[in-house]
Amino acid sequence: MIQRESRLVVVDNSGAKEVLVIGILGGTRRSHVNIGDIVLVTVKSGSGTVKKHDVLKAVIVRTKKGLRRKNGSYIKFDDNAVVLLKEDLNIIGTRIFGPVVRELSDKKFSKIVSLAQLVL
């Protein structure tokens, strides 16, 4: 379960390696998020185009908790991962590492699905 103060892995080539969740967008009383939700993060480690302590938006692409599909199956991952976004919700990086779920295209993140190495 991803909530405030959770540390997440960044899976794009923006330069950040690890981020910390400082806010959850989409409501005042939301306590946790799932795949496809947008969070407010701060960069904890990494180098490149984004610097340490930068505050950015990110979309959740993998969770340990997993995602339940309409056919009843679950997809779970080994880590909690995000892709960093600009203010206009376009992705910062040009590559996505590792698998992502195809349900991201239903949530208007089809660019992430098209750039991913593996779509489940």
UniProtKB/Swiss-Prot annotation:
Instruction: Please give the CDD domains that the UniProt record associates with this protein.
Output: Ribosomal_uL14 (cd00337)
GO biological process: one example? translation
Return the InterPro entries for the record.
Ribosomal_uL14, Ribosomal_uL14_bac-type, Ribosomal_uL14_CS, Ribosomal_uL14_sf
Q: Does the keyword Lyase apply?
A: no
Keywords assigned by UniProt? Answer: Ribonucleoprotein, Ribosomal protein, RNA-binding, rRNA-binding
Which Gene Ontology CC terms are recorded? cytosolic large ribosomal subunit
Transmembrane spans: none
Please name the GO terms that the record assigns under molecular function: large ribosomal subunit rRNA binding; structural constituent of ribosome
Concerning PANTHER family, the annotation shows: 50S/60S RIBOSOMAL PROTEIN L14/L23, LARGE RIBOSOMAL SUBUNIT PROTEIN UL14M
Give the UniProt family note. Answer: Belongs to the universal ribosomal protein uL14 family.
Looking up NCBIfam families in the UniProt record yields: rplN_bact
What HAMAP family has UniProt attached to this entry?
Ribosomal_uL14
> What's the stated role of this polypeptide?
Binds to 23S rRNA. Forms part of two intersubunit bridges in the 70S ribosome.
Quaternary structure, per UniProt, is: Part of the 50S ribosomal subunit. Forms a cluster with proteins L3 and L19. In the 70S ribosome, L14 and L19 interact and together make contacts with the 16S rRNA in bridges B5 and B8.
Name it: Large ribosomal subunit protein uL14
Per the record, the gene is: rplN
